[in-house]
Structures are given as structure tokens and as C-alpha cells.
A protein has these predicted regions:
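Gly/Pro-enriched, hydrophobic low-complexity segments
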Residues: 21-25, 164-241
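An acidic-aromatic
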Residues: 96-149
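Bacterial N-terminal signal peptides that target proteins for export
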Residues: 1-8
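C-terminal motif of bacterial Sec signal peptides marking the signal peptidase cleavage site
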Residues: 15-18
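Edge/loop elements at the starts and ends of beta-strands within beta-rich repeat scaffolds
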Residues: 60-68, 78-83, 90-95, 113, ...
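N-terminal leader/targeting segments and the immediate start of mature chains
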Residues: 20-81
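Solvent-exposed loop/turn segments connecting transmembrane beta-strands
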Residues: 78-82, 102-110, 195-197, 221-224
Length: 241
């Protein structure tokens, strides 16, 4: 993506009819050729296999690049108004995700948000403050089952399984695929449930690109909290779109 914006089948049955040959008052029933019948009967629909095909197509869209750098627009709502600043997104796969927030025009760094495998770092250069914590110490991330690899999948437009570094081909069967709304709403729904967590991905059935990721945490005490992550304006990058 050239620029990143961050915001806090129905089957119809085939009927075969056959007519017997009439001779006087005697009606003969034709002998059905089982071999022919087996060849002409429609094959049963394998929903599980179709789901795996969809998941494989989505997984195949994963970028193979190790490093990514992109300009971004960062918008934060402080409860009264939106504050928007330019920035730079730098990512090194399986190592770090760094968001640098810049002063407009001058483009000097005023803040930084950094996600590494075992910590989260927030730097406020204006007030000369910083916070470094583990993922378990950040309530929003902990409550929504988000760790470094989950965040990396969000940034890299991929599906993920909580607490796992990667999604292997053997893992694809864990996801549920619903293609019933692909024609009406233009998206295929992929879902995964993990305890109190619900993960959903809306996928463009033509490009097999994820266009929306939704993570919902259902708490007995605080109700439901939701994280929505949308994607658009895809650009070619290497041999991938």
C-alpha cells in the first residue's frame, strides 16, 4: 500500500425421467444402467474442501518481503477532537513494527509507537516521557488477545490464530468460511472463535484480499469491546497486490 491510514451457491437438482415402452396393455420398466447413472448424477458438494480452497487463496496473498516502509496518516481522538499528524510506518517481519509520528512540514519525530515480540514502547518526545511494557500489561491488547504476531498479521493483511506465530496449511481447517453473502454484499466471511474472542475477516472474493478484520472480546464484567481494522486502495508490491 502506498499510504496507510490508521483509525483508533445454490445448486439445482437434475431430474432424470425415463419412459417405458408400451406394448398392448403391458408396460415395461426400463432397466437403469447404474454405471451411466453414476456418471450423470451431480457430485455432492464438499463444503469443507471449498472452505480450504478459499483459505488457501487468502493465505497465498501473504507478502514475502522482509522489510516494509510506508508514509502514514495517524489520527487520534482525545475525547474532544481529532488530532491528525503525518508519520512513517517501518516494519521488519517477525521483529518489529514502528510508527513514527512527525511534526507537519518539519517532519521531526514527536512520538513513537513500537511493537516488538516481547514489549510495547510508547515515546512522547514533547513531554519527554516514555512507557515500555509487556503485552500482558497493556489492558486493551491483553483483553483482546492481541500479541506481536496478531498485530503483525493485522498490518500485513493476513489471518491469524491467537498465541501462534504463524498459520500453517494444517491450521487452515480451523477457520469457518461463509460464502453465502459473497454475491449480495461482495465479501466472503471468514471466522474463528477462541474462548471469549471472536475473530472475523471480510474478504473480497475476486482478489482474495482481506478488506476488514474485526476482533471482538466478550467480557462478563465489561461487556463487548471491538477492534476494527479496514483496508483499501491496494497497490502492487513486487509480484503481489
Amino acid at each position: 500500500m502506498k499510504k496507510t491510514k490508521i483509525l483508533l451457491v445454490s445448486m439445482t437438482a437434475l431430474l432424470l425421467a425415463s419412459c417405458g415402452t408400451k406394448k398392448a396393455v403391458i408396460q415395461q420398466k426400463p432397466v437403469q444402467d447404474n454405471k451411466v447413472a453414476q456418471q450423470t448424477a451431480p457430485a455432492p458438494k464438499d463444503n469443507k474442501m471449498e472452505s480450504l480452497v478459499v483459505m488457501q487463496r487468502v493465505a497465498d496473498n501473504a507478502l514475502y518481503q522482509k522489510n516494509l516502509v510506508s508514509n502514514l496518516t495517524f489520527t487520534l481522538n482525545d475525547g474532544h477532537k481529532d488530532i491528525t499528524v503525518p508519520g512513517i510506518l517501518r516494519m521488519r517481519k517477525d521483529e518489529v513494527i514502528r510508527l513514527q509520528l512527525l511534526i507537519p512540514i518539519l517532519r521531526s519525530e514527536v512520538g513513537r509507537i513500537e511493537f516488538a515480540k516481547d514489549y510495547v514502547l510508547f515515546i512522547d518526545r514533547i513531554h519527554k516521557q516514555y512507557v515500555k511494557a509487556s503485552y500482558d500489561e497493556v489492558g486493551f491488547l491483553r483483553d483482546n488477545g492481541i500479541n506481536f504476531y496478531s498485530l503483525q498479521s493485522l498490518f500485513w493483511n493476513q489471518v491469524f490464530i491467537p498465541r501462534q506465530q504463524k498459520v500453517s496449511e494444517a491450521d487452515l481447517s480451523q477457520f469457518a468460511v461463509d460464502e453465502s453473502k459473497a454475491q449480495a454484499e461482495g465479501s466472503t466471511l471468514i471466522s474463528l472463535k477462541d474462548g471469549k474472542m471472536d475473530y472475523k475477516w471480510s474478504v473480497n472474493p475476486k482478489s482474495n484480499q482481506i478488506v476488514l478484520t474485526t476482533v471482538t472480546y466478550n467480557s462478563n464484567t465489561h461487556g463487548a469491546s471491538k477492534l476494527s481494522w479496514s483496508y483499501d486502495d491496494f497497490k502492487a508490491f513486487g509480484s503481489k497486490l
